[in-house]
């Protein structure tokens, strides 16, 4: 589909660090859009798209990449678009339900150079020196969601922050 026409109709402004990223003036109901369900685009925060700049800066030839904590798949789909032709991406998520969502999103994206796994991060220790590029966006307390999701504030707790910190240490 024509991304420029599609985004112009929605009063979109380009994200400076992402070639196909756009800020929208209002949040449409994406779940009612057949193009969203077809995998034509993925909705995520602009900050999540910064991974494209890392790839542009450091990756110039095909690589084997690992997105260790990949669900729901925004960074993985963005990586699949940014990595050089001939690269392979392993998108991992140990939580079964989240891994299913990840697999759906990566499949809809339509890039065959990807594999989805459901392993614990420690399982990849035996792959020392196999991956050229590893992305770790470790699970966190969700404070970044406060401005767009009021319920996130209600779900915040010190114990959740501590649990996330322990999980990050394990990863």
Language-model features: locations:
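S-adenosylmethionine
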Residues: 1-171
């Amino acid at each position: 589909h024509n991304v420029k026409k599609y985004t112009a109709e929605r009063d979109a402004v380009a994200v400076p660090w992402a070639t196909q990223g756009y800020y929208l003036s209002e949040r449409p109901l994406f779940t009612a859009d057949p193009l969203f369900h077809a995998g034509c685009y993925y909705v995520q925060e602009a900050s999540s798209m910064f991974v494209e700049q890392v790839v542009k800066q450091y990756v110039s030839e095909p690589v084997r990449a690992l997105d260790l904590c990949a669900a729901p798949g925004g960074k993985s789909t963005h990586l699949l678009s940014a990595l050089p032709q001939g690269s392979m991406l392993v998108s991992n998520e140990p939580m079964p339900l989240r891994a299913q969502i990840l697999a759906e999103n990566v499949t809809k994206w339509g890039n065959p150079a990807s594999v989805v796994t459901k392993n614990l991060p420690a399982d990849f220790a035996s792959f020392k020196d196999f991956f050229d590029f590893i992305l770790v966006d470790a699970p966190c307390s969700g404070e970044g969601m406060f401005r767009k999701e009021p319920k996130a504030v209600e779900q915040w707790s010190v114990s959740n922050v501590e649990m996330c910190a322990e999980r990050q240490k394990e990863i």
